[in-house]
Amino acid sequence: MADRNLRDLLAPWVPDAPSRALREMTLDSRVAAAGDLFVAVVGHQADGRRYIPQAIAQGVAAIIAEAKDEATDGEIREMHGVPVIYLSQLNERLSALAGRFYHEPSDNLRLVGVTGTNGKTTTTQLLAQWSQLLGETSAVMGTVGNGLLGKVIPTENTTGSAVDVQHELAGLVDQGATFCAMEVSSHGLVQHRVAALKFPASVFTNLSRDHLDYHGDMEHYEAAKWLLYSEHHCGQAIINADDEVGRRWLAKLPDAVAVSMEDHINPNCHGRWLKATEVNYHDSGATIRFSSSWGDGEIESHLMGAFNVSNLLLALATLLALGYPLADLLKTAARLQPVCGRMEVFTAPGKPTVVVDYAHTPDALEKALQAARLHCAGKLWCVFGCGGDRDKGKRPLMGAIAEEFADVAVVTDDNPRTEEPRAIINDILAGMLDAGHAKVMEGRAEAVTCAVMQAKENDVVLVAGKGHEDYQIVGNQRLDYSDRVTVARLLGGIA
């Protein structure tokens, strides 16, 4: 571990900061240890300055604290022999501080940011897989977890704290990573968690209703996503031109790469572009023909559904924009694998096809059902619910979508959290024209079992909402549960 010193860390902001050797950087006083730097920020739920005495008692070497209402910017105090340096707007500066602390890890690998409501996980995984096939040592950071490909460790949030993000990136650099695809959430952008990162390329997948319990309305949600392009080192922008928001952004980003599978591109109006010219769906995926600023080609994809064609094209355009040769990308495309819990297909002789997907927004559920329909000769079943203590407005919308696009809707629990499961189900049913035709079953494992056992061999059962997750939150408890494991057991362990 390279030497870290408080004076060097704060040189751009506080030239007269004292010299102190530093071990680690933390926002959590509970894990602060001897020699650490404790950073006391004012958060949405707690004021970290209240925990300064605890951090001092645990032997920290120094403290950086929010100056607002306490001190002037750059003011230095001492508490029990521990220097406390106050900085104003500490949340906004935290990413830069952590970047200096961890020796600017985003300078030492090729970092691609991916934002949007749906498709972030699949697109980042495709970017990491594809770049590794071309010789990079690739990593991912996001919803499924952080780590080198094949060594991903689960995480709580899509985008961690500003300190966590820089720390994770530094760890990946230490492990030899040369390429990292990172999901960038709207929360992470608004809360400045990636403010000091340098992205040679940034991808926008789409925008639809989600997180309105946090952002309030779609205008603020869109504004949060736009921060990646307006306030960050986003490098080359790659934008989905099939999305209405994407088309608005392309008008503001003349150097962006436009990507489309719905003929929303006029090559004369965009600097660089990539578009599908023909897509044929089959049992094992899709055959995609495309044209682009870099040339034309054909790809055999093992991913299910139209939206995954879009995700793959976005990944392809990004790697082309970064300079990877088209010929090499085409040679390796057939080796790309589906992503865990993202339109993941489970089959067994004599049983229905079961698809497990993370779709938990109205738009994602509609697209997942449309994708499953392309591969369904019989009835299409949909097992889903909605999370408790989250945006209630999307529940009836998802009910209406399940009723319209599935032949059989099975409404059940997702993560009810502290809400009554039946109340959530009732909110979903309120969006259906004929709720009496829906099957209602509160226990999720029981609902999945019911659907899989009742469905016929040529039916498809979409189990939506949890994807890769291996837990269910009921009340304040985090219980062991996995749709993937449940389905695999029902099909005799064959996936």
UniProtKB/Swiss-Prot annotation:
Reactions catalysed, as given in the entry: UDP-N-acetyl-alpha-D-muramoyl-L-alanyl-D-glutamate + meso-2,6-diaminopimelate + ATP = UDP-N-acetyl-alpha-D-muramoyl-L-alanyl-gamma-D-glutamyl-meso-2,6-diaminopimelate + ADP + phosphate + H(+)
PTM entry text: Carboxylation is probably crucial for Mg(2+) binding and, consequently, for the gamma-phosphate positioning of ATP.
Pfam families, per the entry: Mur_ligase, Mur_ligase_C, Mur_ligase_M
Motif (Meso-diaminopimelate recognition motif): 414-417
The enzyme's E.C. designation: 6.3.2.13
Gene Ontology CC entries for this record: cytoplasm
Family: Belongs to the MurCDEF family. MurE subfamily.
Function recorded in the entry: Catalyzes the addition of meso-diaminopimelic acid to the nucleotide precursor UDP-N-acetylmuramoyl-L-alanyl-D-glutamate (UMAG) in the biosynthesis of bacterial cell-wall peptidoglycan.
Designated name of the protein: UDP-N-acetylmuramoyl-L-alanyl-D-glutamate--2,6-diaminopimelate ligase
Species of provenance: Shigella flexneri
Name of the encoding gene: murE
